[in-house]
């Protein structure tokens, strides 16, 4: 018996050592990959605390010699008599309203495709999927012509109103989630006299909350970082979003205030981080459970 126990012990220890080595290598790779991904953000934040001469003379350093908040003060002062809080309010208004419109309209369309039978449902669903393959840049010129004739240029209307007509990606995401709901819930509600609208608001919406929050996070993030759409339709600085305002700190004809650019770019990430951390649980749940059925 002692010989058997002695022979097994080295094998058991050897396997344990292999597991430890494998775990150490795995965590080393994960930590290294995470550091490579967040390094640009760390460098940007560190540069926002450096003086103008130190930003480019100590590129690889993440620790400023003498930390200063002067870049934040200069950046928050804005330009043209408009402080940076105006641009924050514009971006917050744009992202919030656009997110509400995109999520609400997409949920309605997704419910119709998933639970309501109507003539041409398959055809229109195919058309919707085809729009995912169409680059947004292809529609820029015709959309600009239409919005120009409607006198919507230099207003938030071209940025907001199209969001209330749904988003193909969100529709598909919510549709797969709704398809996973038992049909018995709808049938029981119909027996109790509940209409399709009542079923949607009282039963479906509460059950697809993870999918709604997932779509809302994506919509807010995409809208918050959107640069091209505001660049095309907004001309007055008082209407600028954060992305346009940060671009304005860069002037090819004069000295670029890189410190202010890095400082305001760092501040612009705060709302995105807060929303992601607050709703991370719903985001993971919404992505992992979407498409399990249907």
Label the model's feature ranges.
Residues 4-7, 22-294:
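A structural signal for multi-pass alpha-helical bundles of membrane permease subunits
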Residues 1-18:
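Short, Lys/Arg-rich, polar N-terminal cytosolic tail immediately upstream
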